[in-house]
From Swiss-Prot:
It is linked to Ehlers-Danlos syndrome, spondylodysplastic type, 3: A form of Ehlers-Danlos syndrome, a group of connective tissue disorders characterized by skin hyperextensibility, articular hypermobility, and tissue fragility. EDSSPD3 is an autosomal recessive form characterized by a generalized skeletal dysplasia involving mainly the spine and striking clinical abnormalities of the hands, in addition to classic features of Ehlers-Danlos syndrome. One of its GO terms (cellular component) is Golgi membrane. It is found in: Golgi apparatus membrane; Cytoplasmic vesicle membrane; Endoplasmic reticulum membrane. It is a multi-pass membrane protein. Homodimer. GO terms for molecular function: protein homodimerization activity; zinc ion transmembrane transporter activity. PANTHER family: ZINC TRANSPORTER SLC39A7 HISTIDINE-RICH MEMBRANE PROTEIN KE4, ZINC TRANSPORTER ZIP13. Keywords: Cytoplasmic vesicle, Ehlers-Danlos syndrome, Endoplasmic reticulum, Golgi apparatus, Ion transport, Membrane, Transmembrane, Transmembrane helix, Transport, Zinc, Zinc transport. Coiled coil: none annotated. It holds the Pfam family Zip. This is Zinc transporter ZIP13. It catalyses: Zn(2+)(in) = Zn(2+)(out). Functions as a zinc transporter transporting Zn(2+) from the Golgi apparatus to the cytosol and thus influences the zinc level at least in areas of the cytosol. May regulate beige adipocyte differentiation.
Amino acid sequence: MPGCPCPGCGMAGPRLLFLTALALELLERAGGSQPALRSRGTATACRLDNKESESWGALLSGERLDTWICSLLGSLMVGLSGVFPLLVIPLEMGTMLRSEAGAWRLKQLLSFALGGLLGNVFLHLLPEAWAYTCSASPGGEGQSLQQQQQLGLWVIAGILTFLALEKMFLDSKEEGTSQAPNKDPTAAAAALNGGHCLAQPAAEPGLGAVVRSIKVSGYLNLLANTIDNFTHGLAVAASFLVSKKIGLLTTMAILLHEIPHEVGDFAILLRAGFDRWSAAKLQLSTALGGLLGAGFAICTQSPKGVVGCSPAAEETAAWVLPFTSGGFLYIALVNVLPDLLEEEDPWRSLQQLLLLCAGIVVMVLFSLFVD
């Protein structure tokens, strides 16, 4: 440019114009790409919403809705088996259990319960856990040493968990009436009523103040039953996912297997300090675990129509079953067996041993002819 003192100033103008035009073109392209990006994002969100709606639609479709209803009803029937012991155990909490005859009848039931617990662990829960682990192995091969060790570790974890819970929560004592001991309750009542006593003396000393002790072992047994019912819900729902016929057969098999088991659990709750109706209500509350298990099995079912239990449900059952086994072993060997070892009469000890074997034999028969 003439008159400009700076060398090369003539080239600065065209360069400036070129850069300005390039910047404007980039801005126009960016502005034009924003609608495309927005449309792509909208399309992706729509696809995700469609997939979610399709999954919920498949989960609540007509065929799957029948599976939901049948599975929940089957799991509820298994949970309602907890009221069966009310029909076969004529024991009441109170004076009858404190009598010698009532205590002996309870020990007989506990002997049967011990055999049922051991049979349930070694003939039902652990074999089922091994079966789930084998089915989860790649290629359908057998269990590896590491998988077997994991099952053993889960059993130990169940035992230690129940031990820690019993250490943490000490036995709670509920006193119906807390009074200072008085040698002559009639005289005390007369003093409070101006010298006139209208109360009759108790027929038996010691019945005026009722002290009821609820042991932690009862709550631990309820926890183990809830987890056990969760696995039953998994099995019932997985069977109904295959067909209604297999689902009904599985439900009936679990019901037949649970009846002697519920009788033993009922005896353990009576031993822990619950009365008959409280024990029955708490047994019914464990049915919630079965409903949760059935819902979990159906919700984790593969949407591609693969029958049977989903991999997530199989993996859950593979550790829940041995963990529950450890809990039942702890209850049987730590809470029930010591009471039976206190018996010194040889004839009664033999009866307890025979009842223990009877509980195991019942579980063997159900495992052979039902499962």
